[in-house]
């Protein structure tokens, strides 16, 4: 039997049909209600009560959240990646004929939030869209709707490069073409950290062409157009606050892929994904939300422009030379609210009176900020805008009360004296309420009832209340009974009824006029949006650079020299994060020398000795230098790097079914394929995910490839001590090691990196520190002693010859079995005949033209052969 729906439910179902991919928050009075599947899912996600509407088979699942506290529920759903369509009542229920008219006024998605309660203060909330066309690669457009910032970039490559760019961009939502191929759609769906939405239209609407006319590439315009159409569809209003699009050419900043950003823990830690423990946490001494967001952007996109870096360094130096003025400036900046997001909400028409008061207080600090900058010698760099905001500040000072309510419809927003008509209504309301207060006293005297009181509620209006015991004392004829309570009676009189009508009319007109006056003030403020956005950009930059000076002073950083050569020379270098979490003064400083013909350091030494820290230290120093910060070192001379590649740490990629070794090889492949002589490569323990000789052979081949083909500055750590012999034939490679000493059977890690190769790794000692059973570590020590007395095996027969992988095998693969055998038997030393399966794979290997394989194709072949052998 078909369900019989009420007119209201029919309205709900018609609207819901248009928003199948979102929760529909359907406004009913003081609640947002959800029905059917929305209700069931929302009740689970929000842990709220699931009820129902109707009876029996017609019962519809239902749940709801209060309108006034909806933000917290919305935030929880957004955090889980859901979309929410807000359906409001768009006509007054009192005047509605039939069902109240309702419309979806906006769609909230993870990438389109405007409400400051739903946003992280010091993080951008990016939405990204992309477009592609054949071999041209991908056009990427990105926008933070809450600030109005937009940028575009062009990347080359296939779907893997696209996915890396999206992941590295820190976006909350990605907009893909509706007709995206299924394979890429599936890969996008597997990604974590952002949701995927779809939009087909990609032309730039005419009213927004001015924002991107300076950019010629059609691919970028298509991506931007797709993003705009999605924003317009979800926001359902003009996007007047969007700023001119910024084009980021691929070579305009230091590139780091998602692996490098994660491994270096630039903005969050690998383990718990928190800011604490990251580079950002150490150097973020910004005091405004805007400055915090800008610093994060700088860290993720360091400069490659020597002049721009020098400009930032000069400001930091000026702030360091003027301590008192700098701290005075920072005190002023602490009084500045988030002008950038306030400007966006002003343009959006969603700013409230309390936020305009925040803007007023922020602008009142500008003259003092400008005066302080003049004292530091930076008056010409920023601002000089206080005069243009004088009228705006005066408007808000003369119109808005200092502590307005959040609601815009209940009055209390506008100061007395701003509008004559408003003052007249206020006088009427106040005089009427004074008359009411005096009425209570006069009625007590007239009736002799001391407990008589005058009250008010929304249902019955004003009333005179007396106890039942005293009701007989009221004179007949004048008092009309309005309500009977358990212990009291409520009455009205003709005079009270007349005065009530005047008061309520005045209050209603007062609230209506006050809202209209506020809307007019907000409209006048809207004319300043572009200027406010420029002001926000200036304040953000001075905040970041003043913070750089402050952290440099506190942590003893030095100004790096950015050289035009390729030399890297760091004296007394430190890891900026590690030094903050250990006892002050106990951090062991280290030098890094990659000058002259020293391009590559092969780092050996004990586990826990600090090899990975040493490698990350260099990369973080480079990032800090190229964002204009001072660096943790006694002296530092650095070139401009174009890219940083890292392969540090071990991690399976369970989501895509890739092993530790495959992940290791894929990340290494990126470095070998994309690095230039101006890149920095950090490779940690390459080859540990496979057998000893496979790993050693790969490590040597990779070192030789970097030496012969790329020539990039490289730090390569390894436990394969045999590789240290490469320094005899590769003239740009030097051996260094992390030192340790043994005292009375105890190993002391010195964390000092010195020239030369290490002779031991102390792995068994580290196992003891980890708490492995004594029986295990004792046995391991005995086996280690036995192995150390075995005859030395050659490991690098081809070390002194140029490597030709098509013709020459290394000794590691040609002269030994794949894995070291501790206890070989006579039977094990006999050559074994390959199985049928192995012969099949060998035949396929013989057919491969190695010289014409890309590294990725080679990895795919190896993966295919491994699967066949493991069947």
UniProtKB/Swiss-Prot annotation:
HAMAP family listed in its UniProt record: MutS
CDD domains listed in its UniProt record: ABC_MutS1
Protein name as it appears in the record: DNA mismatch repair protein MutS
Protein keywords: ATP-binding, DNA damage, DNA repair, DNA-binding, Nucleotide-binding
Disordered: annotated span: 791-840
Residues annotated as binding ATP: 605-612
Keyword ATP-binding: yes
Alphabetical list of PANTHER family matching this protein: DNA MISMATCH REPAIR PROTEIN MSH1, MITOCHONDRIAL (PTHR11361:SF34), DNA MISMATCH REPAIR PROTEIN MUTS FAMILY MEMBER (PTHR11361)
Any Pfam family the entry gives: MutS_III
Comp. bias regions, Basic and acidic residues: 827-840
UniProt keyword annotation of Chaperone present: no
Gene source species: Shouchella clausii (strain KSM-K16)
Top-level taxon in the UniProt lineage: Bacteria
UniProt-listed GO biological process terms: mismatch repair
Cross-referenced InterPro entries: DNA_mismatch_repair_MutS, DNA_mismatch_repair_MutS-lik_N, DNA_mismatch_repair_MutS/MSH, DNA_mismatch_repair_MutS_C, DNA_mismatch_repair_MutS_clamp, DNA_mismatch_repair_MutS_core, DNA_mismatch_repair_MutS_N, DNA_mismatch_repair_MutS_sf
Function per UniProt: This protein is involved in the repair of mismatches in DNA. It is possible that it carries out the mismatch recognition step. This protein has a weak ATPase activity.
GO cellular component: cytosol
Family: Belongs to the DNA mismatch repair MutS family.
Gene3D superfamilies named among the record's database cross-references: 1.10.1420.10, DNA repair protein MutS, domain I, MutS, connector domain, P-loop containing nucleotide triphosphate hydrolases
Gene: mutS
One of the record's GO molecular function terms: ATP-dependent DNA damage sensor activity
């Amino acid at each position: 039997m078909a369900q019989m729906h009420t007119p209201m439910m029919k309205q709900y179902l018609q609207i819901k049909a248009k928003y199948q991919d979102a929760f529909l928050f359907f406004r009913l009075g003081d609640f947002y209600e959800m029905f059917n599947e929305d209700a069931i899912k929302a009740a689970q996600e929000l842990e709220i009560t699931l009820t129902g509407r109707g009876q029996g088979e017609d019962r519809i699942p239902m749940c709801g959240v209060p309108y006034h506290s909806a933000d917290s529920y919305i935030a929880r759903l957004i955090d889980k990646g859901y979309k929410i369509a807000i359906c409001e009542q768009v006509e007054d229920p009192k005047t509605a004929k039939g069902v109240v008219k309702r419309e979806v006024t906006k769609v909230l998605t993870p990438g389109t939030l405007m409400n400051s309660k739903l946003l992280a203060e010091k993080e951008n909330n990016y939405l990204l869209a992309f477009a592609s066309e054949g071999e041209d690669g991908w056009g990427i457009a990105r926008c933070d709707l809450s600030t109005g910032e937009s940028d575009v970039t062009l990347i080359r490559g296939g779907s893997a490069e696209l996915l890396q760019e999206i992941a590295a961009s820190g976006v909350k939502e990605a907009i893909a073409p509706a007709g995206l191929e299924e394979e890429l759609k599936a890969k996008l769906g597997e990604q974590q950290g952002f949701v995927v939405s779809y939009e087909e239209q990609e032309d730039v609407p005419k009213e927004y062409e001015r924002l991107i006319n300076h950019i010629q590439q059609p691919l970028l315009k298509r991506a931007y157009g797709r993003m705009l159409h999605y924003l317009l569809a979800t926001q359902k209003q003009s996007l007047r606050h969007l700023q001119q699009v910024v084009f980021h050419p691929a070579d305009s900043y230091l590139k780091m892929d998602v692996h490098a950003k994660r491994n270096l823990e630039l903005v969050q830690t690998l383990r718990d994904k928190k800011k604490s423990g990251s580079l950002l946490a150490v150097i973020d001494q910004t005091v405004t939300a805007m400055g915090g967001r800008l610093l994060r952007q700088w860290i993720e996109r360091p400069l490659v422009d020597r002049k721009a870096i020098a400009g930032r360094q000069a400001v930091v130096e000026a702030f360091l030379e003027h301590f008192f003025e700098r701290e005075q400036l920072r005190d002023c900046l602490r009084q500045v609210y988030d002008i950038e997001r306030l400007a966006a909400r002003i343009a959006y028409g969603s700013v409230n009176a309390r936020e305009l008061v925040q803007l007023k207080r922020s602008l009142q600090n500008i003259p003092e900020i400008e005066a302080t900058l003049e004292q530091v010698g930076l008056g010409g760099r920023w601002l000089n805008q206080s005069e243009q905001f004088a009228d705006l500040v005066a408007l808000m000072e003369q119109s808005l009360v200092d502590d307005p309510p959040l609601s815009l419809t209940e009055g209390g927003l506008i100061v007395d004296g701003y509008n004559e008509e408003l003052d007249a209504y206020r006088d009427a309301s106040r005089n009427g309420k004074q008359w009411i207060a005096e009425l209570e006293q006069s009625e007590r005297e007239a009736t002799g009832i001391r407990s008589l009181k005058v009250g008010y509620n929304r249902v019955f209006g004003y009333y005179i209340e007396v106890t039942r015991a005293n009701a007989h004392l009221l004179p007949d004829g004048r008092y009309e009974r309005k309500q009977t309570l358990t212990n009291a009676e409520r009455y009205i009189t003709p005079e009270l009824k007349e005065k009530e009508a005047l008061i309520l009319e005045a209050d209603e007109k007062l609230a209506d006029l006050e809202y209209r006056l506020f809307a007019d003030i907000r409209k006048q403020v809207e004319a300043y949006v572009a200027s406010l956005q420029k002001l926000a950009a200036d304040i953000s930059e001075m905040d970041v650079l003043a913070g750089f000076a402050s952290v440099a002073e506190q942590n003893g950083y030095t100004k790096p020299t950015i050289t035009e050569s390729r030399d890297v020379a760091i004296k007394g270098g430190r890891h900026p994060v590690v030094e903050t979490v250990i006892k002050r003064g106990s951090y062991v400083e280290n030098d890094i020398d990659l000058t002259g013909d020293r391009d590559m350091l092969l780092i050996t030494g004990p586990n826990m000795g600090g090899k990975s820290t040493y490698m990350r230290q260099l990369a973080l120093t480079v990032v800090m230098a190229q964002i204009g910060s001072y660096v943790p070192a006694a002296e530092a001379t650095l070139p401009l790097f174009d890219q940083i590649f890292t392969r540090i740490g071990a991690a399976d990629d369970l989501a895509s079914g890739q092993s530790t070794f495959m992940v290791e090889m894929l990340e290494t492949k990126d470095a070998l394929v994309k690095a230039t002589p101006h890149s920095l490569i950090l490779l940690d323990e390459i080859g540990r995910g496979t057998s000893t000789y496979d790993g050693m052979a790969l490590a040597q081949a990779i070192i030789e490839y970097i030496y012969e083909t790329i020539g990039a500055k490289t730090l390569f750590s390894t436990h394969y001590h045999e590789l240290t012999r490469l320094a005899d034939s590769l003239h740009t490679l030097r051996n260094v090691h992390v030192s340790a000493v043994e005292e009375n059977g105890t190993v002391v890690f010195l964390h000092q990196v010195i020239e030369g190769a290490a002779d031991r790794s102390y792995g068994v000692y580290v196992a003891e520190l980890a708490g492995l059973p004594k029986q295990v570590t004792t046995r391991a020590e005995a086996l280690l002693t036995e192995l150390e007395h075995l005859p030395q095996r050659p490991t690098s027969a081809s070390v002194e010859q140029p490597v030709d992988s098509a013709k020459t095998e290394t000794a590691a693969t040609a002269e030994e079995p794949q894995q070291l055998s501790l206890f070989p038997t006579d039977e094990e030393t006999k050559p074994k005949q390959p199985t049928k399966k192995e012969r099949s794979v060998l035949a396929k290997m013989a057919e491969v033209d190695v010289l014409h394989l890309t590294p990725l194709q080679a990895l795919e072949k190896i993966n295919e052969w491994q699967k066949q052998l493991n069947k």
